[in-house]
Curated annotation (Swiss-Prot):
It is an enzyme of class 3 (hydrolase). It catalyses: a fatty acid ester + H2O = an aliphatic alcohol + a fatty acid + H(+); a butanoate ester + H2O = an aliphatic alcohol + butanoate + H(+); a hexanoate ester + H2O = an aliphatic alcohol + hexanoate + H(+); an acetyl ester + H2O = an aliphatic alcohol + acetate + H(+). This is Esterase LipC. Pfam families: BD-FAE (PF20434). Esterase that can hydrolyze short-chain esters with the carbon chain containing 2 to 10 carbon atoms. Does not have lipase activity. Is highly immunogenic and elicits strong humoral immune responses in both HIV-negative (HIV-) and HIV-positive (HIV+) tuberculosis (TB) patients. Also elicits pro-inflammatory cytokine and chemokine responses from macrophages and pulmonary epithelial cells. May participate in the progression of active tuberculosis both by contributing to the utilization of lipid substrates for bacterial growth and replication, and by modulating immune responses. It comes from Mycobacterium tuberculosis (strain ATCC 25618 / H37Rv). Belongs to the 'GDXG' lipolytic enzyme family. GO terms for molecular function: acetylesterase activity; triacylglycerol lipase activity. The active site is at 237, 334, 367. Its EC number is 3.1.1.-.
């Protein structure tokens, strides 16, 4: 009887999916179903990624075009942009005041660069110490180790960087290089990770991989000169979401059932860069389109039938008094993830958490500014380094006082 009911429920769900499916849904299903087939599977699998990116792009095209048109029609927009970029150091200092010492804030900041940061990728990668290190059992669970050749004798603080990509692209290539190279130059050990993505790996596979990387670092990073007792995590866009969620769900059994018993997935600090922090809210057209994208591509379940999945995946709903220190960075003119996401998240953190919460809102900056905007990227990477170094010093000082 139970088997009949299960079969009936499956059949009803299948019919319901057929009735609401669109052409892109069929392409995604074809790619996922055919990806494991011999011979042709490897050719069908990329179709899912391309389709998923297309679905994501279609949902943001109108916002992007609207913002672009508004800019073009705004008198004196070039002067406004110049002034916004010139204010990066000033707003960064203001955001860190009270968190970072005045002496550290007074040191010389990086000069703005004219060329897009992506053009300097090779220069940053001189700090890559080891490539394609496995952090899990799956061949896709890879990381690069960034560090100086002349490491200090004592264990170095560690940063795990989680790249973005709308939860359908999780490659460590290009992303985060300015932050990784700056911290590596200062003696940190940095781990830049890949993780598995939709549509072939639906949620919560993404966060499970991030948790696996954290547990791996806690157990193994000392082999590369890192301090297993200080692990920070940072990420941009989808990686910002994953970093925040990881920081707020330390050792949550829901997200580490696959890990060995006793694995430690806690982190000591979080930096979220233009991240998405709410998977539930559908109060605006933009947010409703985003949830629809999650339902169709990332989660592959509906929020009406599985509200707990979307709630549990929302960092804004997971904030507790014991949250680690946070630095949240967002551009005021982000048309992919509107800045209200960051503002609401920071408000929640400051109301609940006992730890320090920094918020750096960059005037005029858009999504992905750290790849395209040389005037902002250097100072922002410097601000992140100041924040993380301060958290590390405070933690070390506290440990000495306890001893």
């Amino acid at each position: 009887m139970n088997q009949r009911r299960a079969a009936g429920s499956t059949g009803v769900a299948y019919i319901r999916w057929l009735l609401r499916a669109r052409p892109a849904d069929y392409m995604l299903a074809l790619s996922v179903a055919g990806g494991s087939l011999p011979v042709v599977g490897k050719h069908l699998k990329p179709l899912g990624g391309v389709t998923a990116i297309g679905v994501w792009g279609a949902r943001h095209a109108s916002d992007f075009l609207s913002a672009t048109a508004k800019d073009l029609l705004t008198p004196g927009i070039n002067e406004v942009r110049r002034r916004d970029r010139a204010s990066t150091q000033e707003v960064s200092v203001a955001a860190l005041r009270g968190i970072v010492s005045p002496d550290d804030l007074a040191v010389e900041w990086p000069a703005p660069e004219r060329t897009p940061p992506v053009c300097g990728a090779l220069r940053h990668r001189r700090y890559v110490h080891r490539r394609r290190v496995l952090y899990g059992d799956d061949p896709a669970q890879l990381l690069d180790v960034w560090r100086r050749k002349d490491m200090p004798t004592k264990p170095a603080p560690v940063l795990i960087f989680v790249p973005g990509g709308a939860w359908v692209h999780g490659s460590r290539a290009i992303q985060g290089y300015a932050v990784l190279s700056r911290l590596a130059a200062q003696g940190w050990v940095c781990l830049s990770i890949d993780y598995r993505v939709a549509p072939h790996h639906r949620w919560p596979r993404h966060i499970l991989d991030v948790k696996t990387a954290i547990a791996w670092a806690r157990a193994n990073v000392d082999k590369f000169g890192g301090d297993r007792n200080f692990i920070a995590v940072a990420g941009c866009s989808a990686g910002g979401h994953l970093s925040a969620l990881a920081g707020l769900t330390a050792n949550d059994p829901q997200y580490q059932a696959e890990l060995p018993e006793g694995s430690d997935t806690s982190v000591d600090a979080v930096v979220g860069i233009y991240g998405r922090y709410d998977w539930e809210d559908r109060s605006t057209p933009e947010r409703a389109r985003f949830v629809d994208f999650l339902e169709r591509v990332v989660v592959q379940r509906t929020i009406d039938r599985h509200p707990e999945v979307f709630r549990d995946a929302s960092p804004i709903q997971r904030v507790t008094r014991n949250a680690p220190p946070f630095l949240v960075i967002h551009g005021s003119r982000d048309c992919v993830i509107p800045v209200e996401q960051a503002r609401s998240f920071v408000e929640r953190l400051r109301a609940v958490s006992r730890s320090q919460v920094g918020y750096l809102e960059l005037p005029g900056a858009g999504h992905g500014f750290d790849l395209l905007d040389g005037a902002r990227t250097g100072p922002t990477a410097h601000a992140i380094a100041l924040f993380l170094n301060q958290v590390h010093r405070s933690r070390a000082q506290f440990a000495k006082e306890v001893i």
